[in-house]
């Protein structure tokens, strides 16, 4: 079993309240989860309205497949409206 994790730091420049931030992040998280069959959660900066950190987890039997999924997630987030990707950190665990 291979587990891949991804930490993504975002800036939401057009967000003017926590309500705006939550709306954008909910849309992003739902889209990522459905499109890539991954688990997604907001992991830090919950009370700051212009920055966010989301964590992503993917599980599979092939390390290159898991890495490919995480890379595709990063590329998708880069072009998602309303957010700016600041940093991403990817780790792969398992055989």
Task: Give the role of each language-model region.
Residues 59-95:
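C-terminal structural segments of small proteins and small subunits
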Residues 3, 41-62, 93-95:
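Short, charge-patterned binding micro-sites
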Residues 1-35, 39:
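N-terminal first-folded block
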Residues 6-10, 54-56, 88-90:
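A structural signal for short, well-ordered beta-strand segments
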Residues 1, 33, 49, 78-81, ...:
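A generic structural signal for short, non-catalytic loop/turn and secondary-structure boundary residues
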Residues 36-43, 84-90:
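Short beta-strand elements
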